[in-house]
Amino acid sequence: MEAAQGRLGPEPELSVGAEHQAATFSGRPSRTPSKPPSVRTLSGEEEAESVGVSSRHPRASPKTWSGSIAHGPELDTWEDKPSSRATPSGARGRRGVPGSEHAPPPSSWYPEPEPSEDQPSALRVCRRGSPGGVEMNVELPQQEGDDDDDEDEEAAAGRAGRSFPSRLQDSRSLDGLSGACGGGGSSSSGETGAGGGRRATISSPLELEGTVSRHGDLTHFVANNLQLKIRLSGAPPPVPPASVRPCLTPAPTPTIPPIDPDVLRDLERLSRELGGRVDRLLRGLGGAVQELTALSVGCIQTYRDAVDSLGEAVDMSIKGMYTLLARCEELERALQPVQGLARQVRDIRRTLEVLEALCK
């Protein structure tokens, strides 16, 4: 692509290049005399810019176009510099056709017919040499990868349920992204230069599901509608309605084996025995609880009777003590005359002693 479309000449000769370009897109030969453009070697950035500019022209027109460029005496200079013209690789190589020494035939004035879909169009550069100059027919095709990309996009969009306008918009945005990534890369890549802006991203299904960008060795993928995809992936499959279900579908075979009736009878008998034992256990437990309750009631009554009898005994003792005190007081009052008698007895005894002494 760089060999076919780059190196049109310096900036001061843009008017001449515009006239040739107008004659080329109109499909008719240019009748204005042209000046031989000076040939110069472009740097990597200028080559990338020329590739980006030229890659947009084939997309503008789906048909191939042919241009006629007449060169003057600088033919030898142009052919002697192989380093300034890079031969495209792959199917876009230069196919030289030996031209006549006379003017180009009238058939080259009009655009050539479109190539078929099965046969990919290629970049064709034909040199027709003449003593006065050289004529070069350049046929710039549409990108050969567009058909494959469109088929992949339609298939992936059909699976994802996206509409055709959204796929076209994604394709255009990805083309612009690919052009930006390709313009920032190295100019020595032959495949990028020969592809004419072909996508530098990864497979088409990823491009349809989101945005893919490359920064050096890293590839970034941003999915569209990530929350919706997560919700759809986690949603249970819808149950078909009853009207849609087939009526003649065979019933599923039971996975449980048939039950033996003897097992059921044994299970019933064992259940009854277990129930009887549980009933007897509950009855015994109830009787034991009743006995414990009666014993507890007897203990409580005995304690109450003991407390009552103890209280009565204490009351009787208290009453006896008070009665004894009262009797003691009565006895003291009754013994008061005895003290007088004791005094009289002492007086009589003294009198007797005096009489006994007089008698001696």
From Swiss-Prot:
**What InterPro entries does its record include?**
BORCS6, BORCS6_C
> Where in or outside the cell?
Lysosome membrane
Q: Does the keyword Nucleotide-binding apply?
A: no
Q: PTM Phosphoserine: list the residues.
A: 130, 173, 204
Protein's GO biological process = lysosome localization; organelle transport along microtubule; regulation of endosome size; regulation of lysosome size
Q: Name one GO cellular component term.
A: cytoplasmic side of lysosomal membrane
Keywords, comma-separated and alphabetical: Lysosome, Membrane, Phosphoprotein
Acidic residues composition-biased segments: 144-155
Residue ranges, compositional bias (Polar residues)? 23-33
Region annotation Disordered: residue ranges?
A: 1-201
Question: Pfam families this protein is in?
Answer: BORCS6 (PF10157)
Residue spans of biased composition, Gly residues class: 179-198
Instruction: Please give one Gene Ontology molecular function term for this protein.
Output: identical protein binding
How far does the signal peptide extend, from start to end residue? none
Q: Which residues carry this modification: Phosphothreonine?
A: 41, 201
Q: How does it assemble?
A: Component of the BLOC-one-related complex (BORC) which is composed of BLOC1S1, BLOC1S2, BORCS5, BORCS6, BORCS7, BORCS8, KXD1 and SNAPIN.
What family is reported? Belongs to the BORCS6 family.
Protein task? As part of the BORC complex may play a role in lysosomes movement and localization at the cell periphery. Associated with the cytosolic face of lysosomes, the BORC complex may recruit ARL8B and couple lysosomes to microtubule plus-end-directed kinesin motor.
Name listed for the protein in its UniProt record: BLOC-1-related complex subunit 6
Protein source organism: Mus musculus
Tell me the gene name: Borcs6
